[in-house]
Amino acid sequence: MSRISSLQDPFLNALRKEKVSVSVYLVNGIKLQGQVEAFDQFCIVLRNTVNQMVYKHAISTIVPAKSVRMVYSSFNPYHQNANDDQDENVDDIHSDELEVQENQENINE
């Protein structure tokens, strides 16, 4: 498993397991909405009224509609936490925080 996948996989898996609705922004500006049905190293299957296979290289941002609880493996070199002695670290990703960041970026453009 690559280092990049060690962050993507838990995030996408949490979205899939919790059946969280997501907005997927593509690099060309198109917004797709649905639920993550499945994913692999190269693509994500997004379910709405139909299933769409979206290649990861075309995705800019994935925004969950609600908070997602993520479990990081302790070997993940990219995740730093004050509780490094624990076997796993848990973070909440809040879509409202991501929206604020997105709005600030739009204002700065």
Swiss-Prot record:
Keywords: RNA-binding, Stress response
One of the GO BP terms on file: regulation of DNA-templated transcription
An example Gene Ontology CC term for this record: cytosol
Domain of life per record: Bacteria
InterPro entries linked to this entry: Hfq, LSM_dom_sf, Sm
HAMAP family: Hfq (MF_00436)
Name of the protein in its database record: RNA-binding protein Hfq
Organism listed in the record: Francisella philomiragia subsp. philomiragia (strain ATCC 25017 / CCUG 19701 / FSC 153 / O#319-036)
Upper lineage: Bacteria, Pseudomonadati, Pseudomonadota, Gammaproteobacteria, Thiotrichales
Gene: hfq
